[in-house]
């Protein structure tokens, strides 16, 4: 089956999103006393990994990972693992990052907004992994979204992240 022009265009680089993986909150223990957590973020074939924090169920990563957005409808998945030396890494939960509200606000092309201006508020639902309200705001000329994701497929744990759209001179934009 031949691809339409629209489908071919979707594979062009739309832009870049920086995901600041801030911290883990009350992550599950997978070793005797603690865990050695790290985060993996995937979108299509892209796979990004944070560094490992040793012996900590409340790790501070503060690590920036950058995804190239080719298809805005492609799901972004976040997985947390416990690093093990001699056996396979243990799963510590996962979440899906709903990029749609963030990308929709960016499409509006808002410029020169006052610092801290609330642009959109997203409430937790059964369809997203939000632990609490997530607010998209202007931040010194940038649009950012802070969110705390409730991990699924695990007994406890949350991960705090921040999304930021990065300017891409060669991208087609949204």
Swiss-Prot record:
GO annotation (BP), single: phototropism
GO molecular function: GTPase activator activity; metal ion binding; phospholipid binding
Keywords linked to the UniProt accession: Abscisic acid signaling pathway, Calcium, Cell membrane, Developmental protein, GTPase activation, Lipid-binding, Membrane, Metal-binding, Nucleus
Subcellular location(s) per record: Cell membrane; Nucleus
Chief location of this protein within or outside the cell: membrane
Presence of keyword Lipid metabolism: no
Ranges of residues in domain C2: 1-115
Domain of life of the native organism: Eukaryota
Residues involved in Ca(2+) 2 binding: 31, 36, 82-84
GO terms under cellular component: nucleus; plasma membrane
One Pfam family it belongs to: C2
Entry binding sites for Ca(2+) 1: 30-31, 82, 84, 90
Presence of keyword Nucleus: yes
Gene3D superfamilies found in the cross-reference section: C2 domain (2.60.40.150)
Subunit annotation: Binds to PYR/PYL/RCAR abscisic acid intracellular receptors in an ABA-independent manner, both at the plasma membrane and in the nucleus. Subunit of a complex made of CAR6, PHOT1 and RPT3/NPH3. Interacts directly with RPT3/NPH3.
Family statement drawn from the similarity comment of this UniProt entry: Belongs to the plant CAR protein family.
Function summary: Stimulates the GTPase/ATPase activities of Obg-like ATPases. Mediates the transient calcium-dependent interaction of PYR/PYL/RCAR abscisic acid (ABA) receptors with the plasma membrane and thus regulates ABA sensitivity. Prevents hypocotyl bending as well as gravitropic response under blue light conditions.
Protein name (Swiss-Prot/TrEMBL): Protein C2-DOMAIN ABA-RELATED 6
Lineage: Eukaryota, Viridiplantae, Streptophyta, Embryophyta, Tracheophyta
């Amino acid at each position: 089956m031949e691809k339409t022009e629209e489908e071919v265009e979707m594979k062009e680089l739309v832009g870049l999103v920086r995901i600041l993986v801030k911290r883990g909150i009350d992550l599950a223990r997978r070793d005797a006393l603690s865990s050695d957590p790290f985060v993996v973020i995937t979108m299509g074939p892209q796979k990004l990994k944070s560094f490992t924090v040793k012996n900590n169920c409340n790790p501070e990563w503060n690590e920036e990972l950058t995804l190239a957005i080719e298809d805005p409808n492609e799901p972004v998945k976040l997985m947390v693992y416990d690093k093990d030396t001699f056996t396979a890494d243990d799963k510590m939960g996962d979440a899906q990052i709903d990029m749609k509200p963030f990308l929709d606000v960016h499409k509006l092309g808002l410029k020169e907004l006052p610092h801290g201006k609330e642009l959109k508020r997203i409430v937790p639902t059964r369809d997203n992994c939000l632990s609490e309200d997530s607010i998209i705001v202007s931040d010194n000329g940038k649009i950012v979204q802070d969110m705390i994701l409730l991990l699924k497929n695990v007994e406890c744990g949350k991960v705090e992240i921040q999304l930021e759209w990065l300017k891409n001179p060669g991208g087609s934009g949204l």
